[in-house]
């Protein structure tokens, strides 16, 4: 069954259809949230909040074909709320938070830490655009829907952000 068909069924209250379409995005949602928030617990909480909100609000989704950008918009908002909580709580990121992320070897851990360091040099908006592109695989048009920017602005910011990261990583 195609994604739009599953979404149509989910809009009618079919829980299995919702789970099937949600499961297609779960790992990408988690990757985005993890790199955006910096630790496993907050990422898991944001993805869970996103799933709950998406399930409760799916009947309001006008275009089943837009499910991808719609669910990432929900996660984008969940992550923004989590960041506000982090600021209030003055959370500090600890290397222990990264031990639960599977890695093939020590080199993978080093590379992941280098990427996190490079991402930390970007503004929240730049980081979101890069993560939506790289971890979620969204196109400029879809990122524009999630962030509220124009597709041209997204392409420009993505290019500049990737250049900043490249400079940081070399």
PLM ranges: what are they?
Residues 7-31, 121, 127:
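A short, charge-rich alpha-helical start-of-domain segment used by transcription regulators
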Residues 11-12, 49-66, 85-86, 168:
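Sigma70-family region 2
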Residues 19, 47, 144:
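The alpha-helix within a helix-turn-helix
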Residues 24-27, 35-38, 131-138:
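Short helix-capping/turn signature of helix-turn-helix
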Residues 31, 45-52, 56, 65-77:
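Structural recognition of an alpha-helix C-terminal capping motif at a helix-to-coil junction
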Residues 59-63, 73-93:
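Arg/Lys-rich amphipathic alpha helix in sigma70-family domain 2
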Residues 80, 126, 135, 141, ...:
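DNA-recognition helix of helix-turn-helix
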Residues 81, 89-112, 116-117:
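Internal acidic/polar
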């Amino acid at each position: 069954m195609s994604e739009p068909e599953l979404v149509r069924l989910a809009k009618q209250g079919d829980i299995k259809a919702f789970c099937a379409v949600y499961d297609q995005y779960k790992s990408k949602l988690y990757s985005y949230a993890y790199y955006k928030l910096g630790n496993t617990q907050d990422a898991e909480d944001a993805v869970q909040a996103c799933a709950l909100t998406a399930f409760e609000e799916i009947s309001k989704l006008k275009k089943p074909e837009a499910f991808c950008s719609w669910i990432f918009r929900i996660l984008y908002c969940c992550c923004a709320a989590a960041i506000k909580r982090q600021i209030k709580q003055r959370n500090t990121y600890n290397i222990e938070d990264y031990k639960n992320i599977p890695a093939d070897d020590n080199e993978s851990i080093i590379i992941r830490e280098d990427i996190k360091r490079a991402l930390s040099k970007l503004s929240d908006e730049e980081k979101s655009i890069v993560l939506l592109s790289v971890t979620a695989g969204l196109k400029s048009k879809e990122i524009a829907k999630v962030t509220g920017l124009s597709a041209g602005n997204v392409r420009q910011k993505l290019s500049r952000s990737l250049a900043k990261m490249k400079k940081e990583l070399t």
